[in-house]
């Protein structure tokens, strides 16, 4: 099957596919319409010349290369494409003498398919060799990174740095060239991100090595921390380079990304549970412990972390973990309630507490088992990939030693482990059957090589057979691992809501559990937010979560019984929709408040840690102060990460912002202990310049990452909501200051004033970012003026707070401080108003009465009513032709996933009128064409021309959507929205080109009996996946274009009308 993950492959395959499509149409005209096929000598000669040139270049490459795999895989591709070319030439010759020849038509269609398939194989084989060149450079850097462990002198460090630099530069250049060549946008981003991380870590590595060498040679304290810093940086760089190697080998969508994320999430959850378990059990053992204190919070956090693991599991494992979490949560509520009523020492309370304690042990064991199973399957999967890679090199070398057989045996052993962990017996048996076949073939090949017959035709054929069988085995084990995981919901809130809505609308349709998984994900985030809330707010949010859970279970039960379309199900669906809306609103309100509190000040704890680390050696309680500030910094960093994750989960962010937040949270978690280690080295080596520079490097890296995280969190939540929450928080801080002054508590006053100043500065930061993001001069001017006014009010308030703290009973000072506080509040309100421009009054106010002029003249007489027939009423506006989506007819064979993707795009576009909006018109047209393609792709004879033409029409509409979206982006004043729109719409041309190529491939197979079911199904699968990607990209483009149109330039000549067919409030 053709793959086109690079621009070069795509640019070569597209014209070939275009030529082949003409031949396919001629074939169908001859076969179905009985037309004579015209003389094909000239077009076939053109194809033959292009293919011959490609083969010649390929053969020259094989002659000069040292890549054994390339030498092995190129010749079969040459043979395939040359045989296909021969068939085409024979067909042209036969048709010259007989334009109606049936054998000639068969040669024509088989040759066409062979040309496309063979050319693709040839290009892919060559591309794989290019990738191996880059991987060799990457592996060279990986090997050299391990040398860092033996560098113990400054001379060695200088040499190491000099040697590492050129290799890093070469790798960076190759990766940059490769990412520009890739057609998959996600793969490009992954490569760029990993390479950027490696570049950022290089100075950190040199700094860590330098401090290690310094402390080791001077025999100072802190050598253990220096060693940790160095090893962490080496491991982090190695992990990123390994990720680069993995992504370089991807040719289609990324199937492995979830595995490492899930394993990592489970390990982190397990570590968090272990760290909280003693504190939780201590609270349960103590009948006098207060409800709501750190011990109870530890239990809530354990249940939260275990719930995250449960969501990553499937089937019975998932039900058991989540069920245990819910039960323990309810029992903890009961224990807390009894203690709040003073009955903590009662037999009932003591028994409940003991049951919770035992339940926590059971839950921890379940979580450990789940983590162990996923890690075992993931490790086996990764091990199989490495061993098969090594085995392929052995299979390509006729004189290879016995180590290759060992690699194959190792891969088979790992595959057996996956088979044993499979829940599906059919999958397990399929893998085990493949193991037996590969073992027998490998044994036979090994015997031939030991007899010195490794270069014989039989041995070479066997080697090729084993290579193919190993690739098939890898596909089967990958699928088994993927199927063992639950259905994956979208990573962002709007995506989850959309998936949930689709299931609610059609609960009987099999969506592989995605809709229910999305609802579970939303409910899980609701529980997470509730865990940090207090009293009635917490109970209210939990009640909303339980309501959604109950309604989902009831609707799923009705759907399972075949009653998903019944009136009862419709009523339930309506209730569930309303409950989801309520839950979403309350979650976003809670999350915005938490962001306002936690992100009001991100850097003070690390600055205080820096002060403690540089304290003079004779400072009192130097170590104790440092330990306290290190713990505060660690807790603060953890809170930032947890809150950022909530903002990502329930904010208004798109997928790329969510992934950006997740990446920055991961980096913060990794960096925090390294910053503390660097600070401890500085504490134990006062005055050491190398230690100071190293700490500054680590500190700045942490601060840069948190600033990036803060910016992404601000993108993820509504700016006005954040400003509202900050304004309310400042009011509460002012109220606390009033209480402090009334009770003569200067420290409480200072804390309140400090909080006000931090929140005001946070608002300034948000406003500054929005000004930088906008190109609307009026908006920029208004926000900047309001920000400047706010900026001027902060310092006077701080000065007044210091004055009143020094003499808290002075009424005059108290009044000055409160006046300053109210001035800040007023300035904050003006910033908020700048983000919410006043809407014009509707209806407009009446005219000024003073402008009225009365005269003595009489009004003219009223004209008579028209006589005769009453004119007919105005006819209703004509219905838009593209409104109705075609329903599947009884007995009609269609491709269901393709039809569903088309329907989803049509549903999105139908929200808007296509009058005056060419993007909507083109999107609806594409959806209807894709619905037609879902029928053609399953058709028999007589549909080749229609399939090819349909793909061309879809590509034409795609070009129209892309062109219009770029016009909208050009006029949009919001840089973020513009970038999002361009990123989405720029995917469309590549995908639509691929659709044309894949449709041509599929057309060559329609009605043919000499094609295997597996090959035909593979072609359909690729076409379906491409269609789904295209429909999704256009759907996202429609949404982003609508968002961009709100921020369009007022003087823009280009406009699109966005008129909702169904208003949002209905």
Curated annotation (Swiss-Prot):
PTM remark: Phosphorylated; on serines, threonines and tyrosines. Phosphorylation on Tyr-1065 in activated platelets affects head-tail interactions and cell spreading but has no effect on actin binding nor on localization to focal adhesion plaques.
Post-translational modification Phosphotyrosine, affected residues: 537, 822, 1065
Any Pfam family the entry gives: Vinculin
Pro residues composition-biased segments: 860-876
Chain positions covered by the region annotation Disordered: 857-887
Region (3 X 112 AA tandem repeats): 259-589
Region ranges (Talin-interaction): 168-208
Post-translational modification Phosphothreonine, affected residues: 604, 672
GO molecular function, one term: structural molecule activity
Membrane topology label: Peripheral membrane protein
Start and end residues of each stretch annotated as Facilitates phospholipid membrane insertion: 935-978, 1052-1066
Residue numbers bearing the Phosphoserine modification: 97, 260, 272, 275, 290, 346, 434, 574, 579, 600, 721, 795, 809
Gene Ontology CC terms: actin cytoskeleton; adherens junction; brush border; cell projection; cell-cell junction; costamere; cytoplasm; fascia adherens
Region (Interaction with ACTN4): 741-764
Subcellular location: Cell membrane; Cell junction, Adherens junction; Cell junction, Focal adhesion; Cytoplasm, Cytoskeleton
Keyword set, alphabetical order: Acetylation, Actin-binding, Cell adhesion, Cell junction, Cell membrane, Cell projection, Cytoplasm, Cytoskeleton, Lipoprotein, Membrane, Palmitate, Phosphoprotein, Repeat
Keyword Transit peptide: no
Sequence repeats: 259-369, 370-479, 480-589
Record family assignment: Belongs to the vinculin/alpha-catenin family.
Entry comment, domain topic: Exists in at least two conformations. When in the closed, 'inactive' conformation, extensive interactions between the head and tail domains prevent detectable binding to most of its ligands. It takes on an 'active' conformation after cooperative and simultaneous binding of two different ligands. This activation involves displacement of the head-tail interactions and leads to a significant accumulation of ternary complexes. The active form then binds a number of proteins that have both signaling and structural roles that are essential for cell adhesion.
Record's subunit section: Exhibits self-association properties. Part of a complex composed of THSD1, PTK2/FAK1, TLN1 and VCL. Interacts with APBB1IP, NRAP and TLN1. Interacts with SYNM. Interacts with CTNNB1 and this interaction is necessary for its localization to the cell-cell junctions and for its function in regulating cell surface expression of E-cadherin. Interacts with SORBS1. Interacts with SYNM. Interacts with CTNNA1. Binds to ACTN4; this interaction triggers conformational changes. Interacts with FLII.
Protein name: Vinculin
């Amino acid at each position: 099957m053709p793959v086109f993950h690079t621009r070069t492959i795509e640019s070569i395959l597209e014209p070939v596919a275009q030529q082949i499509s003409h031949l396919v149409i001629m074939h169908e005209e001859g076969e179905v319409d009985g037309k004579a096929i015209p003389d094909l000598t000239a077009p076939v000669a053109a194809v033959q010349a292009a293919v011959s040139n490609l083969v010649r270049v390929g053969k020259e490459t094989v002659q000069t290369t040292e890549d054994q795999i390339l030498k092995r895989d190129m010749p079969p591709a040459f043979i395939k494409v040359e045989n296909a070319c021969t068939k085409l030439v024979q067909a042209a010759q036969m048709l010259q003498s007989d334009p109606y020849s049936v054998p000639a038509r068969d040669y024509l269609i088989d040759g066409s398919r062979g040309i496309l398939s063979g050319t693709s194989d040839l290009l892919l084989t060559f591309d794989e060799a290019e990738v191996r060149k880059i991987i060799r450079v990457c592996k060279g850097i990986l090997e050299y990174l391990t040398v860092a462990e033996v560098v113990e002198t400054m001379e060695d460090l200088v040499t190491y740095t000099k040697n590492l630099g050129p290799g890093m530069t070469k790798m960076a250049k190759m990766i940059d060239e490769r990412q520009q060549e890739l057609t998959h946008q996600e793969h490009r981003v992954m490569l760029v991100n990993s390479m950027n991380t490696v570049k950022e870590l290089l100075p950190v590595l040199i700094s860590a090595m330098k401090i290690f060498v310094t402390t080791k040679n001077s025999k100072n304290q802190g050598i253990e921390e220096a060693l940790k810093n160095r090893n962490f940086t080496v491991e982090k760089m190695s992990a990123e380079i390994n990720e680069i190697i993995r992504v370089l080998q991807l040719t289609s969508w990324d199937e492995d990304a979830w595995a490492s994320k899930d394993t990592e999430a489970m390990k982190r959850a397990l570590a968090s549970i272990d760290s909280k378990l003693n504190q939780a059990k201590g609270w349960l053992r103590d009948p006098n412990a207060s409800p709501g204190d750190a011990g109870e919070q530890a239990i809530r956090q354990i249940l939260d972390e275990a719930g995250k693991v449960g969501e990553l599991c499937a089937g019975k494992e998932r039900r058991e973990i989540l069920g245990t979490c819910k039960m323990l949560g309810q029992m903890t509520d009961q224990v807390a309630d009894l203690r709040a009523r003073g009955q903590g020492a009662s037999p009932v309370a003591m028994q409940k507490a003991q049951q919770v304690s035992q339940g926590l042990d059971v839950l921890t064991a379940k979580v450990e088992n789940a983590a162990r199973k996923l890690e075992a399957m993931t490790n086996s999967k990764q091990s199989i990939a490495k061993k098969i890679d090594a085995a392929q090199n052995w299979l390509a070398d006729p004189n290879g030693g016995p180590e290759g057989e060992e690699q194959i045996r190792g891969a088979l052993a790992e595959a057996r482990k996956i088979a044993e962990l499979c829940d599906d017996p059919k999958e397990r048996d399929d893998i085990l059957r493949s193991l037996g076949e590969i073992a027998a073939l490998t044994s036979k090949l090994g015997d031939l090589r030991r007899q010195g017959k490794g270069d014989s035709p039989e041995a070479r054929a066997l080697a090729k057979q084993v290579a193919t069988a190993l690739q098939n085995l890898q596909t089967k084990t990958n699928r088994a691992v993927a199927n063992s995981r639950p259905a994956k919901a979208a990573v962002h809130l709007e995506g989850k809501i959309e998936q949930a809505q689709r299931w609610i609308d059609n609960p009987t349709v099999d969506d592989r559990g995605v809709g229910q998984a999305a609802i579970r994900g939303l409910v899980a985030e609701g529980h997470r937010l509730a865990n940090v809330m207090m009293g009635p707010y917490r109970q209210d949010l939990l009640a909303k979560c339980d309501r959604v859970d109950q309604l989902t279970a009831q609707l799923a039960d009705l759907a399972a019984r075949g009653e998903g379309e019944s009136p009862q199900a419709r009523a339930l669906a309506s209730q569930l929709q309303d409950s989801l809306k309520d839950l979403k609103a309350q979650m976003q309100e809670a999350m915005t408040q938490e962001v306002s509190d936690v992100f009001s000040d991100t850097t003070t704890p690390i600055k205080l840690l820096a002060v403690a680390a540089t304290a003079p050696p004779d400072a009192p309680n130097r170590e104790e102060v440092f330990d306290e500030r290190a713990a505060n910094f660690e807790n603060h960093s953890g809170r930032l990460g947890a809150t950022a994750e909530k903002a990502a989960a329930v904010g208004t962010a798109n997928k790329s912002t969510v992934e950006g937040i997740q990446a920055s949270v991961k980096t913060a978690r990794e960096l925090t202990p390294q910053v503390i280690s660097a600070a401890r080295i500085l504490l134990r080596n006062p005055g050491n310049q190398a230690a100071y520079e190293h700490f500054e490097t680590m500190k700045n890296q942490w601060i840069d990452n948190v600033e990036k995280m803060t910016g992404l969190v601000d993108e993820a939540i509504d700016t006005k909501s954040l400003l509202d929450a900050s304004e309310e928080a400042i009011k509460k801080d002012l109220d606390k200051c009033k209480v402090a002054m009334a009770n003569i508590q200067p420290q409480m006053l200072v804390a309140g004033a400090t909080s006000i100043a931090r929140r005001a500065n946070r608002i300034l930061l948000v406003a500054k970012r929005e000004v930088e993001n906008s190109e609307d001069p009026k908006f920029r001017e208004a926000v900047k003026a309001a920000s400047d006014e706010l900026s001027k009010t902060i310092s006077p308030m701080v000065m007044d707070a210091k004055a009143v703290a020094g003499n808290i009973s002075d009424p005059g000072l108290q009044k000055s401080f409160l006046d300053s506080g109210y001035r800040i509040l007023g300035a904050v309100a003006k910033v908020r108003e700048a983000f919410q421009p006043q809407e014009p009054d509707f209806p407009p106010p009446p005219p000024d009465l003073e402008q009225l002029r009365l005269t003595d003249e009489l009004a003219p007489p009223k004209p008579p009513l028209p006589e005769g027939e009453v004119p007919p009423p105005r006819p209703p506006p004509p219905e838009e032709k593209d409104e109705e989506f075609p329903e599947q007819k009884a007995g009609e064979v269609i491709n269901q996933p393709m039809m569903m993707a088309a329907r989803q795009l049509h549903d999105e576009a139908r929200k808007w009128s296509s009058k005056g909006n060419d993007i909507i018109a083109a999107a609806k047209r594409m959806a209807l064409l894709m619905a037609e393609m879902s029928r053609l792709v399953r058709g028999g004879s007589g549909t080749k021309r229609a399939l090819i033409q349909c793909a061309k029409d879809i590509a034409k509409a795609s070009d129209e959507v892309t062109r219009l979206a770029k016009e909208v982006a050009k006029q949009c004043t919001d840089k973020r929205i513009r970038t999002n729109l361009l990123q989405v719409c720029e995917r469309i041309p590549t995908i639509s080109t691929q659709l044309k190529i894949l449709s041509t491939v599929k057309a060559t197979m329609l009605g043919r009996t000499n094609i295997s079911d597996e090959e035909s199904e593979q072609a359909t699968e690729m076409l379906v996946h491409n269609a789904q990607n295209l429909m999704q990209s256009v759907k996202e483009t429609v949404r982003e274009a609508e968002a961009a149109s709100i921020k369009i330039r007022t003087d823009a000549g280009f406009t699109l009308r966005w008129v909702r067919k169904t208003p949002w409030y209905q």
